[in-house]
Amino acid sequence: PHLSKDYPLYANTRSNYYQNNSCSRLMDKRQSPLLNQTLDEHLLGVQAHATLVARSLPSLTRSLPALKNHKPLKKRSADPRFAWQDKAADLAASVSARAAHGGAFIVNMASTGCGKTLGNARIMNALADPGTGLRCAFAMGLRTLTLQTGRVFQNDLQLSDEQLAIQVGGAASRALFEYWEQQAEATGSASGQALLDEAGTVLYEGNDQHPLLQRLTDDAKAHALIAAPLLVCTVDHLTPATESLRGGRQIAPMLRLLTGDLVLDEPDDFDMADLPALTRLVHWAGLLGSRVLLSSATLPPALVEGLFLAYRAGRSVYQRHRSERPSEPVNICCLWIDEFHQATQGCADGAAFREAHTRYVHKRVAKLQQAEVRRLAQIAPLPENWHSMEEAERRKDFARLVLEQAWQLHQHPHNHSTDTASGKRVSLGLIRMANIAPLYDVALAMYAPDALPPELQGQVRIHLCVYHSQFPLLLRSAIEQQLDTLLNRRGARVDHDPALHRPALRALIDSHPEPHHLFIVLGSPVTEVGRDHDYDWAVVEPSSMRSLIQLAGRVRRHRPGAVGGVNMVVLDSNLRHYKMPDKPAYEKPGFETEHAPFQLKSHHLHDLLARAIGTNAAWAVDAQPRIALPADNKLLPSRRWTDLEHARMHDSLLPKPQGTATPTHAACLQWHEPQPETPRSLWLTGLLPQFQRFRQDDQKRDDVALLPDEEEETLLLHRVQDGERRYEKLYVPIHQSLCHPVPAAQLASPSVSPWPQVGLMEELAALAQAQ
């Protein structure tokens, strides 16, 4: 009720369209909105509401569900390869009291394929108070989380639907996010916004009823995100904690960080422009009392140190306000974990952390140098005449070249399996491309009659799977489900490959008479992270050393033992270089820029990797160049591929010496105070999220939808447009003008056939029937 009907000031408005009037939809769209709340009612209501919320916050963590005594997280590993998990959990348990008092910053650098997912959960479980249990968010370094990825995580940890929430999808686009913020600002009703992006889905079957959550929102997705003991999501789902400027989008992720710990999976996979936002998230995690774990085999020193400094700055604020000893100096419990050894040390400042981290990395590098070599790579030269070719012809020639490299790799005995039933030789390989745009043309070119030389016709059968991030989410999830099954090579022996006994693969081998079968995934960079796949070999169009190392982790991932020869071919450069030779080639993805000192003088890997590989024809691909600085600590970012990455990270994440200018996009602006006696406290303002945009995308985009026709037999493309009323959507048919199906004749190759056979209409029908 209005406290004073005659109060002259109003706080907000509401749209005419909300009136219960059958004629409201016919009213002029430009008509003035109705005044809603008087200012006195609004302010007194906010005060009462905020008081109740603030009084409930201290007990929130103790009241929410937690994971207690989960046996799979305590079970000792029977496999010697995963014994490091037991040692890591034991070490974490031994320092849990220190971590509870002073915070914890954990670095897990175990090699790809060593079971970091389960290891991370076991470490965080060991750190948690046994009396209250584990509450933790696992944030993946992906833009979009498919249900298939979430279910794999759930199965790895043996969690029920009452113990884990899976936030499927990606965060809203920047344009859509800003549009609704502007709409809320225009009406003064920002507090009425939904707390989560409407496009996402949170799958959780547990108890999400808590008085505070009921008061904050009636959004079941927000309840689940906050209440679930364990949450698996993308970093995009948590960054609104620091990136939202209006409304309530920050509330749910803030409360998630306030009531649990944080694991960042593959944090070094982010674009350089997104590292400031990642730094802000880690700073806030420290400020709200979370313990943080970074998990990646390719963590560069500057990134680890920069995120530690951000966490320390946040933790110092937390300690001043919520610690039992607020005047005590900050001393964070730090842990370093990998498959070789584990270490812990209290670090009061950046210098102590840097020294301890450097010492640990040196030990790791020494172990990597002694380890068995499972991935051997060589550089493949590219034709000089590509510079003068038309782009379409160059892409066709690229398709022929990578198929030739794939055939050469397949022929090595260590890169294929022999089917005992038929004597056919079978391999599963990956051709990684740097960008999606040329991938479509390259895939079509592989179906051309001349894609394989005449002498291989009738001898070689290519089974081609195209896989990238721009598929409709349901279709991408279906492809991933099949790849996850087929590329699980656990239990493989010299005379036994589990892949050959999968019914889907078996049927394809038996239905084609050729003696050689190459199952090829032609994929974008999405193939590098988040997928537990084991390939026999890989052909790589390069982007960065980081991506090369991550991709190498998908080759012989499940099969220990030294490889008998080369199983990776890295092209000497990429297609972007031949399209624009004077422009940066290793960007988007990559670390090169147009500005010195971060523009490379050469785009040929035989120049950029000369120091690393010397005169060797083949070299071992592992994490050494990414995790360690050069022995002389001198970086030449314009001449060396790995130095470029280290220099970019150092420039963005670490504070500059006093007296030098700090770049506008420096990640350290969130926490670094050049003059502590006069702090700027930029993190208390909304300036940085405006000038250092997360997932900045200036390209204009349209929303489109595939809708079934009247007979529900065909999907037709429509453009999604805003209607007259708020939230109204119009679907404008554009199928005839913008959708160009590939003629069946263009895919009728004598040697190449599509694999797997996945149809969106069939997947939709199956999903509808299942629900």
Predicted features and spans:
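N-terminal accessory nucleic-acid engagement/regulatory domains that precede
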Residues: 1-75, 156
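Conserved interdomain linker/interface between the two RecA-like ATPase lobes of SF2 helicase motors
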Residues: 294, 304-308, 313-439
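The feature captures the C-terminal accessory region of ATP-dependent helicases
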Residues: 390-424, 428, 434-457, 461, ...
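Conserved SF2 helicase motif VI
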Residues: 545-568
